[in-house]
Amino acid sequence: MSIDINWRTATSGPDGEALAERIRSFIHDRFQQVALPRFIRSVQVHSFDFGTIPPELEIKDFCEPFADFYEEDDDADTSDVSEDLLSEHSSQWDRTHSELNEPPYREESAMNHGLRDPFHEGFPPSPLRSPLGEHLNPHFLPRAGTPGIPGGTSNLGYHLMSLGGLSGTQTPLAAVAGGNPFASGWSDSGMGFGNRGRSERQGPIPQHRPEPEIDTSNSTSRPSTANTLPSHLSESNNLNADGATGRNERGSLHNGDPLADHTCSGHLPLPPRMRERRPEDFQVLCHAKYAGDVRLSLTAEILLDYPMPSFVGLPLKLNVTGITFDGVAVVAYIRKRVHFCFLSAEDADALIGSEQQQESGGDDHRPRSGADSSAHTSQKRQGGLLQEIRVESEIGRKENGKQVLKNVGKVERFVLAQVRRIFEEELVYPSFWTFLI
């Protein structure tokens, strides 16, 4: 099913201008973090324009959103919790307060009640909430994640309580087919606080009850979980590879020593908080083709080394006049948020590869042979998602249509390589952008 987009309406007006300025500012900030070669002093991004040619979109599938889209961030925690969760628990506050005033231990209550919801009990939040939540996807900023398709560390939130059955990374297809992450009966809000709340109210365990399998006698000597996880991740971590490092450190809990230490001490590391799945949540996979006139204006200052090193700086103006793109886009709608990203070539093949292989036949609609098909696929992947970036440069005078300065070509190649890298690092899953609607 194909989609017609009113490109002018979507990219013009105050909202379109604000989005274009936000994209320009984001690309400019990324260039300020790039290590420049010796012959370039600085790179400035001046303008961004969506152009007039819309992309071609073909819907391939409707499915459940990827698991990573349900991770909560602290900025949006207040509105979601106050409106959704607290309203559901308001009728139980009276019963909760009466339970807190009961004797510290009751055998029947302890044996029959499951893990308690932290919203029922007035316990302070765990110190782990802040380190795990500060770096999770600020508004309108992409989040870098663990390389590979999806799963990553989000599986820790799904399977943490069954320590013997931790699953590794999954493909997007497996993540989508996984269904409700809380099908086993464990609620995310009850994972971190239930055991602690019950033990504080119940006091010491009588002798006639079985001894716990985990020795907690030496728990005070164990290092805290916060020491094994990144203590803070600034906003810049979401804009470079440092964000991926933080996710990898969280992922090390699957098979590393920190998990064993906290299991022995009786304190389980808390998984990232996950939003509740709702029936109205959905995700669309689209095959996106674009050969448009999107424009990006940059200036780079070239350093001249004659008659001495870095003798003078000469501004070079670069104009990206269009790009050619072919890939699979993911658009997920969850509550009042829209998550957007692209899939890498390998991940796209895992989801809709069979259809693209049929379409990759020759013009006579005959399927390609094995050698031709593999050569075509490798040729397509060699250029990445951005197959072509058209650029124009302006500096000084020209001779026979060529630039006088020999470093102009080097500057063009460097800038284009950085534009391609920024696109693939910030918009290709597991990185994604979130828009509030």
From Swiss-Prot:
MF annotations from Gene Ontology: lipid binding
Membrane topology: Peripheral membrane protein
Feature: compositional bias, Basic and acidic residues: 91-101
Domain SMP-LTD residue range list: 1-437
One Pfam family linked to the record: MMM1
GO CC terms in record: endoplasmic reticulum membrane; ERMES complex
Region annotated Disordered, chain positions: 73-101, 187-274, 354-384
Gene Ontology BP annotations: mitochondrial genome maintenance; mitochondrion-endoplasmic reticulum membrane tethering; phospholipid transport; protein insertion into mitochondrial outer membrane
Key word Ion transport present: no
Bias type Acidic residues, positions: 73-85
UniProt entry keywords in alphabetical sequence: Endoplasmic reticulum, Lipid transport, Lipid-binding, Membrane, Mitochondrion, Mitochondrion outer membrane, Transport
Subcellular localization(s) per the UniProt record: Mitochondrion outer membrane; Endoplasmic reticulum membrane
Polar residues composition bias: residue spans: 215-240, 371-381
PANTHER family linked to this entry: MITOCHONDRIAL DISTRIBUTION AND MORPHOLOGY PROTEIN 12 (PTHR28204:SF1)
Family as reported in the entry's similarity comment: Belongs to the MDM12 family.
Function (record text): Component of the ERMES/MDM complex, which serves as a molecular tether to connect the endoplasmic reticulum (ER) and mitochondria. Components of this complex are involved in the control of mitochondrial shape and protein biogenesis, and function in nonvesicular lipid trafficking between the ER and mitochondria. Mdm12 is required for the interaction of the ER-resident membrane protein mmm1 and the outer mitochondrial membrane-resident beta-barrel protein mdm10.
Comment, domains: The SMP-LTD domain is a barrel-like domain that can bind various types of glycerophospholipids in its interior and mediate their transfer between two adjacent bilayers.
Subunit (UniProt): Component of the ER-mitochondria encounter structure (ERMES) or MDM complex, composed of mmm1, mdm10, mdm12 and mdm34. A mmm1 homodimer associates with one molecule of mdm12 on each side in a pairwise head-to-tail manner, and the SMP-LTD domains of mmm1 and mdm12 generate a continuous hydrophobic tunnel for phospholipid trafficking.
Name of the molecule in the record: Mitochondrial distribution and morphology protein 12
Species this chain originates from: Aspergillus clavatus (strain ATCC 1007 / CBS 513.65 / DSM 816 / NCTC 3887 / NRRL 1 / QM 1276 / 107)
Name of the gene this protein is made from: mdm12
